[in-house]
Amino acid sequence: MKLPVPPDLVLGSSLKAVSLALLCTLGGAAKAEFDASRLWVNAGFYSAHFDADKGLRNANPGLGLEYALDERWSLTAGRFINSNDRNSSYVGAYYQPWQLGPLKLGVVGGAFNGYPNAFNGGWFPALIPTATYESGHWGLNVALVPPLKDRLYGALSFQLKFRFQSGL
């Protein structure tokens, strides 16, 4: 079924809906007032694909937000250009209960869209193993994206993040 509006408008609306959902969740989940030191601005991704011969885009520019609820949980949402050179949006929650030195280990669970071979570009759920390093104003999320047959190509993805106030 084709929508009577341009695809960019639909994707833009999706991101607005995702952002609104994240903000509502942040508001409802907050035990205290907003703490700027818990807010990260995330860049897109650099993805080292396991199928390097498929002509996939490794540089995935984008912009997202991540808000740490506590030492183990954080919420995230954003938009980027995916490996198929399409616009994608995401929304999710990190759960990282394990520490290995300076690394936090766990998973991010959530939903993505924009992959033409996965659910016709629509939203789909994902559970992805992650590691995070954070120090002062800078951090790095590393995700092991599993392949999904011929629908989604696997990769080791790196996401830089920045916060204006260090803390937590």
Where are these regions (language model features)?
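Outer-membrane beta-barrel "beta-signal"
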Residues: W40, F45-S47, Y153-L168
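Short glycine/proline- and aromatic-enriched beta-strand/turn motifs that initiate or cap beta-hairpins
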Residues: K31-R79, S89
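Cleavable N-terminal export/targeting peptides
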Residues: M1-A36, L168
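Repeated loop/turn-to-beta-strand initiation elements of outer-membrane beta-barrel proteins
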Residues: L39, E71-L75, G101-L103, G136-V142, ...
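Outer membrane beta-barrel
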Residues: L105-G114, F119-G121, I128, Y133-V145
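Transmembrane beta-strands of outer-membrane beta-barrel proteins
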Residues: N42-Y46, T76-G78, G106-G110, N141-V145, ...
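Residues on the lipid-exposed face of transmembrane beta-strands in outer-membrane beta-barrel proteins
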Residues: A43, L63-Y67, A77, V91-Q96, ...
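Solvent-exposed loop/turn segments connecting transmembrane beta-strands
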Residues: F50-N58, F80-S89, Q99, N113-F124, ...
